């Protein structure tokens, strides 16, 4: 799976998980632009963990603001 494939899958999972109608880009801010509550973010992260078969450490997610930063984190975790 290429980096571009991973990024597309992340956006697909987020769109499905949050049922957002926004056009998501790497610059979309998860809280500010999408208006997600902390509970919605937890559900979204669970869906991403399931989709990629990974665990996203809470300590790592604290500094993530945008979908692009989330993509970078997931790609980093996938590379091990």
Where are each of the predicted segments found?
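Phosphopantetheine-dependent thiolation modules in NRPS/PKS and related acyl-activating systems
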Residues: 2-36, 40, 44, 50-80
């Amino acid at each position: 799976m290429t980096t571009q494939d991973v990024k597309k899958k992340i956006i697909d999972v987020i769109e499905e998980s949050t049922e957002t109608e926004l056009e998501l880009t790497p610059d979309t801010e998860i809280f500010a632009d999408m208006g997600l509550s902390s509970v919605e973010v937890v559900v979204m992260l669970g869906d991403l963990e399931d989709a990629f078969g990974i665990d996203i450490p809470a300590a790592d997610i604290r500094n993530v603001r945008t979908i692009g930063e989330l993509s970078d984190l997931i790609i980093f975790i996938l590379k091990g």
